Amino acid sequence: MTTRLWDRAAVAVVADGRRFPAVAALGPGEPTVQELFDFMRDAELRFATLRMRILERVISTRGDDTTQIDVMLRHPGHARVTTSRPGEELGGTYEVWISDGDIVRTYAAQHKLGTQRPIRNRPRGLDDKDFPGMSRIYEPITGLPMETLPETFVHPAGFCQNVLATGRCQILGSRTVSGRSTIGLRCDHPRTVELPGDRPDHSMEISVDRDTGIIVRLVETIGGSLTRDAVATVLEPDASLPPSAFDYTFPTGTTMLF
C-alpha cells in the first residue's frame, strides 16, 4: 500500500521528434503502484489505432442505468465516440463526437442538435519545467472528449495523478477482464470534485491491461454498495478501421448550434 503522491503525468520520452513509452512493458511479476502508474501514463503510445467498447452501469436512487460507448481512434488526431443504449434499435437515441485533430463535430439524436467547432487550445505554459509535477498535465496525441470514460481509460495519466494518487492505493494482483490479462488496483478515499463521493468509505478498483496500460474496468463503491461498474467488453489495439471511420454527415433536419 502507498500514500505517496504520484506526479509524473507530464513526463515524456522524446527522440527525433517522436514520443515513446518510458516503460516499454511490465515485468512478469506484480508492479509497485508507482511502476503501474508510470506504465499507464503512456498507454496511447503503444498502438496506432484502437477500437473499444465500454459498457457502463450506474446504480443510484433512481435505479440502474446502462450506457454503451463505442470508440474508434487513429493517431494522430482522429477519434470517434458514439454513446447509445445497449440493444437499442438503429436510429434511436445516441450521441456522436468526432474529431480530426482540428475540428470537433457533435450530434445528439434525441434533440437533433449538432455542433462543429475548432478544438479548444490548451492553456499555454503548462509544460514549464519549473512547475511542480502536480501542476503539469498529460498532452495526448489524439484527444478524446474531456471527463468521459474513453478519456479516463485511454489517457489514464491525469486520472492517476489527480484522483488515484490522492487516495490509499494497493496492488490487487493479476486478473482476467474480457479475455485480457490485467493488473488490479484498489484506491480508498480518493479526492473527488463531486461532494457525494468525497467520503472515507468511497473506493475505486481498476483493472489495467498488461499489454497497453489502458484501463479496462472501473468499479466504484460507497459504503460497500456498488455505484458504478464500467468495463471494456471490446479492446482491439492496432485494429483495422474502415476508411470512412471518421467521416460524418449531419442528418437532414439537424439544428446547428454555434
Indicate residue ranges for each PLM-predicted region:
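Short, charge-rich binding segments
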Residues: 72, 87-91, 95-99, 109
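Short amphipathic beta-strand/extended segments with alternating polar/hydrophobic composition
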Residues: 93-100, 113-124, 229-232
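Beta-turn initiation residues at beta-strand->coil junctions
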Residues: 56, 83-86, 107-110, 219-223
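Gly/Pro-enriched, hydrophobic low-complexity segments
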Residues: 86-88, 157-158, 162-257
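N-terminal leader/targeting segments and the immediate start of mature chains
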Residues: 1-78, 115-117, 122-137, 141-150, ...
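Short glycine/proline-enriched turns and hinge-like loops at secondary-structure junctions
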Residues: 63-65, 92, 97-98, 180-181, ...
